[in-house]
């Protein structure tokens, strides 16, 4: 299980949103490629990037930053936001991106996901962004009636790399993850799962390790790292396979 620092891009800047609200945005001072390089120097094994402008509009507008990051860092990067065609995916791979994340397009065009997962096995990640268990699309602006669990079951048939499951109600709050939601997803798929949303302290990471045996392979963290709630090196120690002690599993919890 690994920590994955997040970089959200808007107008060429690193930003964080509160519960996915574009009107509740906080800008950070470092340039995106400087932030990515900093995460790498601090011990990150992978970086998660979202083009928020593209997620909202469907049109890429931060490619200069994306190309710079791909060139500057020597660790894998995964990117999402407005990725809705084969041409766009091939373009991102040409920049040096390791994996791409499909959200809105996956929901609206399941056949595309099937074809892409065949063409690029284990390089397509499906992003499931949910509020109260139902999927949101187009940068979390539109709310659907589609259950996150139904989508996970359907896409588990394809040769995708992983699912990223984000609980929008916890994202950017630093108040802890929605473990009930995470566990529910893990129980219905054999595809690796990455959790996102709500991590605010090292104890939140420690708590998530109890799901590792169910297939939780990573956790995306943004605001907590930007606000120095803990260091990447501390998180790596907690999540490492060589950690001294696992979280005791409460058998009643998993019953």
UniProtKB/Swiss-Prot annotation:
SUPFAM superfamilies linked to this entry: Ribulose-phoshate binding barrel (SSF51366)
One Pfam family linked to the record: His_biosynth
UniProt subcellular location: Cytoplasm
Assigned keywords, A-Z: Amino-acid biosynthesis, Cytoplasm, Histidine biosynthesis, Isomerase
MF (Gene Ontology): 1-(5-phosphoribosyl)-5-[(5-phosphoribosylamino)methylideneamino]imidazole-4-carboxamide isomerase activity
Entry-linked CDD domains: HisA
Enzyme class: isomerase
Documented EC number(s): 5.3.1.16
Annotated signal sequence range: none
Superkingdom classification of source: Bacteria
Catalytic activity as recorded in UniProt: 1-(5-phospho-beta-D-ribosyl)-5-[(5-phospho-beta-D-ribosylamino)methylideneamino]imidazole-4-carboxamide = 5-[(5-phospho-1-deoxy-D-ribulos-1-ylimino)methylamino]-1-(5-phospho-beta-D-ribosyl)imidazole-4-carboxamide
InterPro entries: Aldolase_TIM (IPR013785), His_biosynth (IPR006062), HisA_bact_arch (IPR006063), Isoase_HisA-like (IPR044524), Isoase_HisA-like_bact (IPR023016), RibuloseP-bd_barrel (IPR011060)
Active-site feature positions: 8 (proton acceptor), 129 (proton donor)
Gene Ontology annotations of biological process type: L-histidine biosynthetic process; L-tryptophan biosynthetic process
Pathway: Amino-acid biosynthesis; L-histidine biosynthesis; L-histidine from 5-phospho-alpha-D-ribose 1-diphosphate: step 4/9
CC terms in the record's Gene Ontology section: cytoplasm
Annotated family: Belongs to the HisA/HisF family.
NCBIfam families in the cross-refs: 1-(5-phosphoribosyl)-5-[(5-phosphoribosylamino)methylideneamino]imidazole-4-carboxamide isomerase
Record-given protein name: 1-(5-phosphoribosyl)-5-[(5-phosphoribosylamino)methylideneamino] imidazole-4-carboxamide isomerase
Source organism of the structure: Prochlorococcus marinus (strain MIT 9515)
